[in-house]
Amino acid sequence: MWCLSCFKPSTKHDPSEDRFEEETNIVTGISLYEDVILRQRRSEADQIEWAIQDSFNPQETSRCRQREEDDQIARGLQYVEETELDKSVVDEEDQQLSKIVEESLKEKGKSKQFEDDQVENDEQQALMVQESLYMVELSAQLEEDKNISTIPPLNEDAQLQKVIWESAKGKGQIEHFKDPVEEDGNLPRVDLNVNHPHSICDGCKSAIEYGRSVHALGVNWHPECFCCRYCDKPIAMHEFSNTKGRCHITCYERSHPNCHVCKKKFPGRKYKEHPFWKEKYCPFHEVDGTPKCCSCERLEPWGTKYVMLADNRWLCVKCMECAVMDTYECQPLHFEIREFFGSLNMKVEKEFPLLLVEKEALKKAEAQEKIDNQHGVVTRGICLSEGQIVNSVFKKPTMGPNGELVSLGTEPQKVVGGCEVTAILILYGLPRLLTGYILAHEMMHAWLRLNGYRNLKLELEEGICQVLGHMWLESQTYSSSAAASSASSSSRTPAANASKKGAQSDYEKKLVEFCKDQIETDDSPVYGVGFRKVNQMVSDSSLHKILKSIQHWTKPDSNL
């Protein structure tokens, strides 16, 4: 049989149990303290170990720093992009508002009669509005941020009125009211005629009616008073530029042409112009080393290439195309000039050589002839009367790889003396027409010497020779088809002696006129004055009568 018993714990306190609990608590506390110390030591050991690892891994540290810097740069670029996007949005809103203002201004014209004047006024107001758009936009943004705006939304007309009012207020055209909002909540109406600082026309100095002004160059004008200083015609706003002053843009361009040399606008209004070719150029190009053609006297434009001859003379491309380069090439021209003198009944009987030479050879021959050139005239030809040795150009140069003339052939040639005329020397490399004029001039010197006209006054002798050169140039203007009729009507410039080289180019025709102009406008006391005096005598009489008069007045070898 089972027995069930009940057990009840004793509630009596045992002192030995208290001591055991205290010891247990002490042991537990010591254990916890040791755990804390152990964890601290482990944490310090871990930190030291991490520091040691970092010190042995500088590349990892550098990469971390580089990533941080890249993150900063990326954030900066993102900020700049957001700022530019906001600015583009503001610019687009400004353009839309400007279009609204312009359309609104065009619809508010007073009448069709003053439509043109109103359009000009609207353009001025639109410009004024555009100048103040940014300020108005910024002011509106500040007001919105401060949450102090109590003005209800405005319709399109009210917005336009506000913009114009703000702009006029900023320019001092209306008074600054303490409260820009009237009782009805709208902005006060703008009267642009109130306290207007520019109500007087700068042209006629009289008052300007509302809507009839043009604002330019910082002042106001009547439309009819704002005229071009070149053509005196009114200037429309689309024909005007502040940088060019009170003139049409087209008139300014015509009055301020580009330099023929550097193709730039002239500084100010100072420039030089060739008296014949009418080519305008900057004054400093005369001294800055710009090449000048020794034949036509034109300066070399940038982008072109002049040719330098062996004696350092420059020749332009057009003159080079028709230049006579050696003695052999000049012989047909020599025969042509002799025929020209024969047609004037002034045949040159004596045969003597014609030689093309370089500049130095010509100077040397001039010195041996004891010719005293005191008049600053460039010598391009000479009639010799003494025997000497001359370096003649017998082989024309060829064009080198860099555009220079090379392989010029010269040879010494003995000129035999004992005669009134021993030879004629002319610079090589000049155009055929200029060479022909010089040859005609020197041939007249030869004719005078061979016919006993010696010891003439220099002004008279050079004047006669210039007249013959001028006459030959005039003969070159005749066409071969008109030769017969011209020869019968004029004894001075027979067309039968027109150029035998064939049809002249347009440039050669112009070069003939240039050479004639050089003779006619020469201001030297010997060549220029002498030509004009003799030419006047020949015009009043004839060349033969003048020569006979000189022969009658004086005996050969006398001083006239």
From Swiss-Prot:
InterPro entries: DA1-like, DA1-like_dom, Znf_LIM. Residues 43-62, 92-111, 155-174 form the UIM domain. SMART domains: LIM. Residues 199-269 form the LIM zinc-binding domain. Gene3D superfamilies: Cysteine Rich Protein. The keyword RNA-binding does not apply. GO terms for molecular function: metal ion binding; ubiquitin binding. Interacts with ubiquitin. Ubiquitin receptor that probably regulates developmental process. This is Protein DA1-related 7.
